[in-house]
């Protein structure tokens, strides 16, 4: 029997045995048994049809992304050397290696920066060439979970960066200043953010949306995006579309294009020298 239509059978035949009344359609049943007018019966049937999903068409299931991480190399010597040449503190490098946020790929010896979810499962991986200009992502990467280092305790502030290396550069400078680099949330945006032509129509980066949902106590967002036109425009766009409940601060690097330039300048590492060292290390392979 069809739900909501009494004694109407699926083959559209019905019989009210006590009254010796029968018919061949739901329309007959509603008029003869339920006492609806012709138009009322039509509207009722049409209304039920509108809310019932089609029987013959199955809803498509949203396929989940499967992250295909590059095979890990047994050592991380090239990656460690590469990051040290860029001024990153060894304590930070060891932390990332230990927590599964960083490793060296077996095939091309790329640096693999892994984004993990709250269950500590890998969901995203940024690839960075050691001694080359290669930049990419592992297949199946979910940008909602880009590289990050959450604060070790409750915190109301998150700092945003374009890349994992910029994030680690900022954390290194925090350590150089005698501060606890695990005191605040650190989040990368997995590359350059491209706003809409009309800034007010831009979307908040998916990784930031996810992060703010998972850390609802965050009240302040500090921008450390690049000191170029793209970085300045991205900062302006995101600040424009963020809900007004958040306080925002813009703190681009004081020297150079990005925070790694800033760090290297502070440490006296010239960019040409560190790039040359990385390239030489790459040729040694």
PLM features: residue spans?
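Short active-site loop/helix that positions an aromatic residue
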Residues: 32, 167, 171-176
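Conserved mixed alpha/beta catalytic, RNA-binding, or beta-rich assembly cores of soluble enzyme
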Residues: 160-165, 191-194
């Amino acid at each position: 029997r069809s739900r909501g239509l009494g004694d109407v059978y699926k083959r559209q035949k019905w019989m009210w045995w006590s009254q010796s009344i029968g018919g061949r359609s739901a329309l007959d049943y509603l008029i003869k048994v339920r006492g609806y007018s012709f138009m009322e019966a039509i509207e009722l049937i049409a209304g039920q049809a509108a809310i019932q999903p089609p029987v013959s068409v199955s809803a498509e299931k949203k396929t989940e992304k499967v992250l295909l991480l590059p095979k890990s190399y047994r050592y991380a010597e090239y990656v460690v050397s590469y990051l040290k040449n860029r001024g990153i503190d060894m304590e930070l490098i060891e932390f990332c290696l230990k927590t599964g946020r960083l490793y060296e790929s077996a095939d091309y010896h790329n640096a693999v920066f892994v984004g993990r979810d709250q269950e500590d499962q890998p969901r995203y991986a940024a690839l960075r060439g050691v001694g080359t200009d290669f930049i990419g992502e592992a297949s199946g990467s979910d940008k909602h979970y880009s590289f990050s280092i959450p604060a070790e305790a409750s915190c109301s502030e998150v700092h945003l960066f374009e890349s994992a290396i910029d994030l680690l550069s900022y954390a290194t400078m925090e350590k150089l200043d005698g501060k606890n680099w695990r005191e605040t949330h650190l989040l990368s945006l997995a590359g350059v953010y491209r706003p809409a032509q009309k800034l007010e129509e831009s979307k908040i980066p998916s990784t930031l949306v996810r992060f703010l949902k998972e850390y609802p106590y965050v009240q302040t967002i500090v921008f450390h995006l690049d000191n170029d036109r793209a970085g300045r425009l991205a900062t302006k766009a995101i600040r424009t579309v963020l809900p007004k409940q958040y306080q925002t601060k813009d703190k681009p690097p004081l020297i150079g294009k990005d925070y790694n330039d800033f760090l290297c300048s502070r440490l006296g590492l010239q960019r040409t020298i560190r790039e040359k060292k990385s390239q030489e290390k790459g040729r040694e392979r």
